[in-house]
């Protein structure tokens, strides 16, 4: 609605306002039956709890690849941070598909950057690390363990001792039924954080699943050997 959009543009974070709109700024002469009658004046009560200014993101994305690479790195990092914050909000609202898309958008902006110095590459990797971690956990929520593992491993390429990445890779391996690999990741994570409850609980779960699998394999091989001996008599 035109009136509400105009009103919101006048407000600040935390502000509470009431707007009374004439029909032409609300639902017009037709109204919105059956709830809103024709030519109705509308009273809105609005409070701005928080907002995200995406203006600089839109401006940056509209640039050509050459123009983006010419932009100072601090500005790029600001744009990436804004996109990441939006992704975090969506994640916290359990809107995982949208969160994934925002994280991937931020990641693409960083990956496409042409870095000419080691210092700049380090800053880009530092910004990529939380995005890879966020993508990994988001893919776990979306039940895509292969993709969760992909991004977890990308995070480990930047920081091989990152416990969040090790934990998420361990969880992805568990969901894929690759218990030995899961155990290896979680043991490495446990070595860094021996008293972390999430790591210890998941490691315990993996150990139980791994033992059950080995026991079943042992029983199967025992039965196969028994059947083979029977055929040879």
Where are these regions (language model features)?
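A beta-strand/beta-hairpin structural motif
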Residues: 1-39
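Alpha-helical segment of the N-proximal tetratricopeptide repeat
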Residues: 73, 78-111
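Alpha-helical adaptor scaffolds
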Residues: 96-165
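Intrinsically disordered, low-complexity, charge-biased linker/tail regions
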Residues: 204-207, 211-233
